[in-house]
Amino acid sequence: MLPAQNKLTSSVQFRTTMRKGRRAGSSTVVVHLWDSAESLDGTGEKGEVASFGGPRFGLIVSKAVGNAVIRHRTSRRLRHVCARIAADSPELLTPTHHVVIRALAGSGQASSQDLERDIRHGLRKAGRVRTDK
């Protein structure tokens, strides 16, 4: 289960992460990564943002993934993977990072290991995560 402090909770957080963040995709997921400490005025300087308990994750699982049973199973798998990545937080992501994971049609048939591999690969491609994992 993904703890509450690791969840994106508002549509504004989702929208900002999707629009301002870097995107990387694979055959099963698209990963959007945004550092909420980045300034929103475009100057490139880091802002002073207090964030507790991050990094924060959000999921988008559409009907393209499958019927309700498959979508819920996929969501549970993605939440479990996000919890594992959040546990690795000190070496992977800072508390100010927001991650939105959009499940693609192929994610309904993918195993948890495949999903975790693709998410970690997406985070690396987005330019934040070190490649030693």
From Swiss-Prot:
Enzyme class, first EC level, given as a word: hydrolase
Name the InterPro entries for this protein. Answer: Ribosomal_Su5_D2-typ_SF (IPR020568), Ribsml_uS5_D2-typ_fold_subgr (IPR014721), RNase_P (IPR000100)
Q: Which residues cross the membrane?
A: none
**What molecular function terms (GO) are annotated for this protein?**
3'-tRNA processing endoribonuclease activity; ribonuclease P activity; tRNA binding
The record's GO CC annotations read: ribonuclease P complex
The record's EC number reads 3.1.26.5
List the SUPFAM superfamilies: Ribosomal protein S5 domain 2-like
Which keywords belong to this entry? Endonuclease, Hydrolase, Nuclease, RNA-binding, tRNA processing
**Reactions mediated catalytically:** Endonucleolytic cleavage of RNA, removing 5'-extranucleotides from tRNA precursor
Q: Alphabetically, which GO biological process terms does the record hold?
A: tRNA 5'-leader removal
- Domain of life per record: Bacteria
Described purpose of this protein according to its UniProt entry:
RNaseP catalyzes the removal of the 5'-leader sequence from pre-tRNA to produce the mature 5'-terminus. It can also cleave other RNA substrates such as 4.5S RNA. The protein component plays an auxiliary but essential role in vivo by binding to the 5'-leader sequence and broadening the substrate specificity of the ribozyme.
List the HAMAP family hit by this protein, alphabetically: RNase_P
Q: Which family does it belong to?
A: Belongs to the RnpA family.
Q: How does it assemble?
A: Consists of a catalytic RNA component (M1 or rnpB) and a protein subunit.
- What this protein is called in its record is Ribonuclease P protein component
Taxonomic lineage is: Bacteria, Bacillati, Actinomycetota, Actinomycetes, Mycobacteriales
What gene makes this protein?
Answer: rnpA
